[in-house]
Amino acid sequence: AELEYTHWADGIKTYFLSYVDLVGSTNFGDIKNVFGTLTKTKKGFSYSKKKCPRVPYHSDCLQIALYSKLLPKHKPFLTYASNDDRVIFTPENCVELRTESLQYYYEELVLYQKCWETKLELANGDAKVLAMLCKPDLSEIRKDGFWWKGIDPDIIKRFRSYYE
């Protein structure tokens, strides 16, 4: 079961609410699944296997950096697993999980939050203004990417209307 933690960030004067997958007496870590792609074919379905990353994904480094602030006396690890591959990253085998790297990622996470805070202040409650401050990747809609697959066309039309 995930454990809930909060962390006050002075740089943005707010709390982060976090749920850490695994916490032991000396270590904490997160478990990531790496899924292949299921594709419909003329004969049914085809599943393409996906390898685990050779270095942690950037967003996961930001997450572990935050967790390291929540659990400063614990050593981090990050695992990825697919149906036929697995990898465990630790500070011993991964530069990204070392203390100095995690501090860099934490500062980057705070910067992202400051940017969002500024966008929200500039928008002043106007969703259309906020949308214009956040460049969309419209190519993902056109490609019917993962996040857009199966979304009602009316919702896509409404989303696009914020950019007109």
Residue positions per predicted region:
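Classical nucleotidyltransferase
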Residues: 29, 40-69
